[in-house]
Regions:
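Conserved ABC transporter NBD signature motif
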Residues: 67-81
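ABC ATPase NBD coupling module
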Residues: 79-106, 132, 255-259, 292-296
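Short catalytic/signature loops enriched in Gly
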Residues: 81, 155-158, 251-303
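A short, proline-enriched helix->beta-strand linker immediately N-terminal to the Walker B motif
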Residues: 183-187
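A short, surface-exposed alpha-helical micro-motif characterized by mixed small hydrophobic
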Residues: 231-233
Length: 303
């Protein structure tokens, strides 16, 4: 029996940044897969490389960043920039990614106020991508935008389309970001810290919305977060990142109830437990994250 290919396969992905201090190897040969209809959580503290991995996938690295090795097989096609060497080839790569970004792969960013243009109406920001990828009329794009706003729970969408980002609350702006991400029925949705800037009540609402989307869609989803509570409630599998490496990968139950790697165990032990004796202090992970300028080939947690 032939196994179906995963929607996304990352194999040996390496990304580095040129800095004044030297070369920072931000990703050191990471591997993971995402299947259709699956939710993968990528968890790690700040600087672990989790967002760099997604920017590498989307072709959105800063000018000093480069994917130096690895394959990124999306829907059966390698979209890694590694094989594009000449100026002409790099233009071909950018043309390919422009067709994929926002269409087949979409991204939900963590700070909606920074992502949304403050001087452009919500209607224009929502319909721009729809018209670019679907080649539809202005009226058809507007109807799709209204439909999407209803889907993500924004009341009176017809009138609110004419408003600007500052006229919406933080939670509503995040819903708009999610609506934009869903506009072209993507095969893969990447959510980068989708609840970080929101209060607890709004976080729960956004998580419920993401859960509903994953249940009703066949799209694969990647959730990037440092919040283990988010992945526990939403994800099928979890990859734990540290120092540019994936330290451990498993189902949500395996990671939470049977962790293998010392870093994963330390991460779980450092979480406040509502059932624990509150007189006992939290157990922080000792030491500091490794300096990626100096880290060799050893396990970053062992360093």
């Amino acid at each position: 029996m032939v196994m179906d290919m995963s929607l996304l396969e990352i194999r040996g992905l390496e990304t580095e940044f040129q800095t004044e201090q030297g070369v920072v190897k931000a990703l050191r040969g990471i591997d993971y897969t995402v299947d259709k209809g699956e939710v993968l959580g990528i968890v790690g503290e700040s600087g672990s490389g989790k967002s760099v991995g997604m920017l590498s996938l989307m072709g959105l690295l800063a000018p000093n960043g480069t994917v130096t090795a690895g394959e990124m097989i999306f829907d059966g096609e390698d979209i890694s920039p590694v094989k594009y060497k000449t100026k002409k080839e790099k233009k071909e790569y950018e043309k390919k990614m422009n067709a994929i970004r926002g269409n087949d792969i979409s991204m939900i960013f963590q700070d909606p106020m920074s992502y949304l243009n403050p001087i452009v109406t919500i209607e224009k920001q929502m319909t721009e991508g729809i018209r670019a990828h679907d080649k539809c009329s202005k009226q058809e794009a507007r109807e799709r935008a209204v439909e999407l706003m209803k889907m993500v729970g924004i009341p009176a969408p017809e009138s609110r389309l004419k408003q600007y980002p500052f006229e919406f609350s933080g939670g509503m702006r995040q819903r708009i970001i999610i609506a934009i991400a869903l506009a072209c029925n993507p095969k893969l949705i990447v959510a980068d810290e989708p609840t970080t800037a929101l209060d607890v009540t709004v976080q729960a609402q956004i998580l419920d919305l993401l859960r509903k989307i994953t249940e009703e869609s066949d799209a694969g989803v990647i959730i990037i977060t440092h919040d283990l509570g988010v992945v526990a409630s939403l994800c099928d599998r979890i990859s734990i990142m540290y120092g540019g490496n994936i330290m451990e990968e498993g189902t949500t139950d395996e990671i939470f109830y049977d962790p293998k790697h010392p870093y994963t165990k330390g991460l779980l032990n450092s979480i406040a437990n509502s059932n624990a004796d509150h007189r006992e202090p939290l157990k922080p992970i000792p030491g500091t994250p490794p300096d990626l300028l100096k880290l060799g080939d050893q396990c970053p947690f062992a360093s």
